[in-house]
């Protein structure tokens, strides 16, 4: 274990986050995550349930919590160390609306107004598709997901797969090898767990 602090500077926020070995991007704010936070869509007006899927040490969850104080932000990760760091970073930043959880701790009937993720592409295509199916099907009617994916790691093929499986997907922006994908809830399927 080697805890260390890193700074996240955004136009509207200046945060210091604690990170450690054994979590994604332990030595820096990942450039894809930074891009998503700078260019990604804002939460819908009146949103009450937001999701950071694969929260890591909490960069996205903490920013969402501070930008959307009336919403509850679910920060979900399979890594216990990441969850501990996310929880501590949310408390330190004053984002008391961030709820850190294991995937199976999220109430089954809960639906999300919006989801943000820098998804774990390197887990493999089948595992990634299963992960996205599980959580995209929990978008509320009209809900949207905002994903950042490196183009060389399959952003375009992922967008095609999402479209093919009924989630309307648009490439909202592209820069420095990253794509920002906006994904809409499947029509007639919103909020139906699989």
Please annotate each region the language model reported.
Residues 1-47:
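SAM-dependent Rossmann-like transferase core, predominantly class I methyltransferases
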Residues 1-2, 154-194:
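Class I S-adenosyl-L-methionine
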Residues 20, 101-103, 172-174:
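Conserved beta-strand termini and adjacent loop/short-helix elements that scaffold enzyme active sites
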Residues 31-117:
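Conserved SAM/SAH cofactor-binding pocket of Class I
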Residues 114-126:
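Glycine-rich phosphate-binding "P-loop"
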Residues 121-123, 150-155:
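Short "lid" loop at the C-terminus of a central beta-strand within the Rossmann-like core
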Residues 129-141:
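A short glycine-rich, Lys/Arg-flanked "PGG" loop and its adjoining helix->strand segment in the class I
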Residues 142-149:
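Conserved beta-strand signature within the Rossmann-like core of class I S-adenosyl-L-methionine
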